[in-house]
């Protein structure tokens, strides 16, 4: 028997701020750092001791139009981060991040990425559109200075819908691997494409999830 921290949901702390620009504009920032509840050790990053490794970004937006975010953030296929669409659309059937009880144990999830940009629309008839690009998913492994072909990139699109008692999500993610051998990925590894489609609807006390 072994007890481990942060299996269901990561412990984290951080700073957030927002400033209004004009009547409907705004700029805000997010700084979040994950940590293990039993030791206090920084978590959510492969780089030991990296501060604000969960999220570090600045967001510029306008109410009713949408927003653009720049910095370090998680992808759409997951439940961690501001733009995680599994959480935003309630796709996890047990509302858990534990691998044996969550989508991450079955479907490909998204990494937390450096040098990322997200464009998000305001909801239109319940539909929210998002796009994401990362120029170098992990600066520690793939320094941006090595050039475009020698860094790992991520491209993603997502459309989420929220109704009165139902939600749906369609997302596509492509990881373009670096043109260098690294771990399990050989030299000139082909990109991976992941498509996720899911829906959830409540029927009284019963909720059905399909993905």
For each of these PLM feature ranges, what is it?
Residues 1-136, 151, 160-167:
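Outer membrane beta-barrel
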Residues 36-40, 77, 134-146, 150-153, ...:
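Sequence/structural signature of outer-membrane beta-barrel proteins
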Residues 118-120, 128, 138-139, 197-200, ...:
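Non-transmembrane, interaction-prone segments in cytosolic or luminal domains
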Residues 150-211:
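Detector for outer-membrane/organellar transmembrane beta-barrel domains
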């Amino acid at each position: 028997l072994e007890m481990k921290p942060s299996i269901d949901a990561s412990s984290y702390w951080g700073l957030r701020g927002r400033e209004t620009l004009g009547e409907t504009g705004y700029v805000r920032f997010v700084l979040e750092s994950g940590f293990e509840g039993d030791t206090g050790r920084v978590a959510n990053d492969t780089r030991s001791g990296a501060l604000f490794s969960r999220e570090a970004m600045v967001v510029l937006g306008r109410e009713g139009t949408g927003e653009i975010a720049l910095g370090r953030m998680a992808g759409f296929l997951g439940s961690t981060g501001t733009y995680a669409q599994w959480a935003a659309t309630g796709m996890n059937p047990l509302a858990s991040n534990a691998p044996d009880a969550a989508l991450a144990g079955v479907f490909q999830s998204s990494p937390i990425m450096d040098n990322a940009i997200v464009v998000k629309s305001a909801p239109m008839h319940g539909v929210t559109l998002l796009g994401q690009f990362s120029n170098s998913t992990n600066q520690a492994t793939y320094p941006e200075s090595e050039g475009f072909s020698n860094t790992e990139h991520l491209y993603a699109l997502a459309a989420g819908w929220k109704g009165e008692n139902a939600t749906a999500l369609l997302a596509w993610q492509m990881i373009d691997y670096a043109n260098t051998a690294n771990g399990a990925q050989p030299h000139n590894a082909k990109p991976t494409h992941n498509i996720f489609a899911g829906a959830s609807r409540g029927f009284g006390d019963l909720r059905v999830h399909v993905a």
